[in-house]
């Protein structure tokens, strides 16, 4: 009888464990070539935590996972993500398509070692769902995952508005699900032979959840806080997390034209560029910003955005109801060229051949009728992708959807 009470307690504990099944685990593969992939991974982790879904989300840096097999590092001594970020900082993007194909060919050469390496990692992982927010390596990831976890789902979340085939985002691997942020990407998935059950389409690109928080920010108050005039039209220059040398050329042209304009210039982690701006005298009122997590708030102070046609920058501008001015030419990254087509199709901004035309582009944008049309078109867009993606994950995990 002395053992009966402890035994009953153990049985109660066992019953409680059975009532509360083990927490589902999601592993997200990302890298730091550009800032968008990490941003997507962190946004997913954040929104899932906020929704209290009972999932454990693990972020895995793909570059670190595969470092000793880094295919470009073997050729040049520099990591893939470092090469990419150096190209962006310096504007060395002419011929990027050819470089991209060299990278993809090299990845295919190292296909078997990559699959073996990844399979070894997945054997030590008890994830219930694998998510990739990176391009180029999805065939290797899909094959390795299938070897180790043939009954568990693998999904690629495309962080560009469209794919740049072949072997960029969408692969022929039967076990690859894809999440597309546009009808164009969904069409591309169907064209490669993806079954409809393996294609999910969201209402746009995923953004950080804080873009959706109630915000009563006063644009005029923010301008005053930044030392800008409250009544002047305000543009924002945003060229990714590392800035770009072209920003200096843009401001020089606008400054020389003496347009009735002021600018918020986001230099990101490019402190040298920020120091150059601060060290010059300008006719235009400028507010210079280095790296900041407040871009979403500063956007309230702007009337339009000038930037590179990255999917994240475009999506953030649309979320803040800002028309955009972009350029598209031989220097534009190949995977970002469709983004400019999307802007033209949706009539939400102006696409220039190059930023030497920036003065004319700004004048055109600020014409009252043009600006009003662009604002109406931007306002008509409704992007809820960050909340739609967890519902897709729930489906892939075999869980019920949550009502809105």
Each predicted region: which residue ranges?
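A short, well-ordered alpha-helix in the C-terminal region of glycosyltransferases
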Residues: 370-384
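Donor-nucleotide binding loops and adjacent catalytic segments primarily
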Residues: 217-301
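C-terminal alpha-helical cap of glycosyltransferases
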Residues: 383-404
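Acidic donor-binding loop of glycosyltransferase active sites
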Residues: 300-313
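C-terminal "capping" alpha-helix adjacent to the active site of nucleotide-linked donor transferases
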Residues: 344-347, 353-370
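Conserved N-terminal ligand/cofactor-binding loop architecture of enzyme catalytic domains
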Residues: 43-125
């Amino acid at each position: 009888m002395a053992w009966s009470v402890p035994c009953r307690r153990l049985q109660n504990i066992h019953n409680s464990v059975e009532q509360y099944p083990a927490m589902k685990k999601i592993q997200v593969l990302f890298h730091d070539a550009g800032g968008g992939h990490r941003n997507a991974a962190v946004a997913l982790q954040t929104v899932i935590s906020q929704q209290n879904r009972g999932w454990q989300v693990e972020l895995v840096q793909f570059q670190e996972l595969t470092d000793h097999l880094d295919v470009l590092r073997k050729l040049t001594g520099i990591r893939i993500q470092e090469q990419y970020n150096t190209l962006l900082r310096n504007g060395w993007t002419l011929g990027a398509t050819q470089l991209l194909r060299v990278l993809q060919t090299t990845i295919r050469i190292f296909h078997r070692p990559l699959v073996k390496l990844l399979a070894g990692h997945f054997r030590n992982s008890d994830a219930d769902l694998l998510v990739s927010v990176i391009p180029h390596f999805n065939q290797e990831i899909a094959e390795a995952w299938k070897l180790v976890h043939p009954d568990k789902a693998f999904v690629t979340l495309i962080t560009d508005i469209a794919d740049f085939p072949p072997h960029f985002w969408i692969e022929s691997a039967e076990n690859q699900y894809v999440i597309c942020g546009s009808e164009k990407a969904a069409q591309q998935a169907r064209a490669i032979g993806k079954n409809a059950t393996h294609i999910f389409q969201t209402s746009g690109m995923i953004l950080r959840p804080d873009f959706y928080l109630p915000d009563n920010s006063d644009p005029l108050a923010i301008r005053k806080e930044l030392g800008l005039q409250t009544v002047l039209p305000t543009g924002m220059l945003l060229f990714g997390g590392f800035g770009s040398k072209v920003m200096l050329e843009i401001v020089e042209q606008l400054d020389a034209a003496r347009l009735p304009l002021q600018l918020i210039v986001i230099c990101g982690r490019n402190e040298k560029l920020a120091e150059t701006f601060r060290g010059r005298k300008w006719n235009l009122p400028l507010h210079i910003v280095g790296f900041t997590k407040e871009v979403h708030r500063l956007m309230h102070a702007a009337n339009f955005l000038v930037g590179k046609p990255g999917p994240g920058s475009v999506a953030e501008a649309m979320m803040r109801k800002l028309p955009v001015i972009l350029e598209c030419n031989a220097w534009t990254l190949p995977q970002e060229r469709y983004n400019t087509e999307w802007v033209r199709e949706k009539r939400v901004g102006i696409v220039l051949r190059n930023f030497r035309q920036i003065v004319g582009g700004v004048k055109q944008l600020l014409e009252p009728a043009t600006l009003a049309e662009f604002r109406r078109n931007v306002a008509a867009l409704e992007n809820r992708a960050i909340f739609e993606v967890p519902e897709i994950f729930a489906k892939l995990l075999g869980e019920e959807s949550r009502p809105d």
